[in-house]
């Protein structure tokens, strides 16, 4: 039989960090580090323009603002469907970036209660790829 996961009252909040380094015009090294309370997380890189568009939509569209009063939670919603899911520290080179472009690396951690009931705060790390 299939069992639904149990809910842990007062479970500690999940958090994570994102470090950006080794930038080239088309690549970036990202190190995602979850804390001990994080059982998994979603990550992605958005252009800074796309990231700001999502925040602005959450601030200005009443139907979205009602569901996501914190605009960053709207980004977390997209990460669940668009992002990569990880369970431990990841150190990766992201490729096929555009030279001279502003990006926002984002991460949405979750605790033992899962993504729906245990999502932590959005982690962000802005960076710009060099022109050459």
Task: Locate predicted features.
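Extracellular fibronectin type III
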Residues: 1-9, 88-91, 110-132
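Proline-enriched interdomain boundary motifs that mark the N-terminal boundary
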Residues: 10-18
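Ser/Thr- and Asn-enriched, surface-exposed coil loops between beta-strands
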Residues: 19-29, 130
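Hydrophobic beta-strand core residues of beta-sandwich domains
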Residues: 22, 34, 97-98
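Solvent-exposed loop/turn segments flanking beta-strands in beta-repeat/beta-sandwich domains
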Residues: 29-68
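Non-globular, low-complexity intrinsically disordered regions
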Residues: 65-85
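Surface-exposed, short loops/turns at beta-strand junctions within beta-sandwich domains
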Residues: 80-87, 93-102
């Amino acid at each position: 039989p299939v069992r639904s996961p149990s809910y842990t009252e007062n479970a500690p909040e999940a958090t994570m960090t994102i470090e950006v380094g080794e930038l080239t015009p088309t690549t970036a090294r990202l190190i995602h580090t979850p804390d001990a309370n994080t059982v998994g997380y979603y990550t992605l890189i958005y252009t800074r323009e796309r990231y700001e568009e999502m925040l602005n939509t959450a601030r200005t569209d009443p139907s979205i603002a009602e569901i996501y009063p914190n605009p960053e939670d709207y980004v977390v919603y997209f990460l669940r469907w668009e992002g990569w899911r990880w369970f431990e520290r990841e150190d990766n080179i992201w490729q096929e970036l555009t030279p001279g472009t502003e990006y926002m690396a984002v991460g949405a951690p979750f605790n033992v209660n899962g993504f729906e009931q245990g999502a932590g705060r959005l982690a962000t790390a802005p960076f710009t790829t060099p022109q050459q």
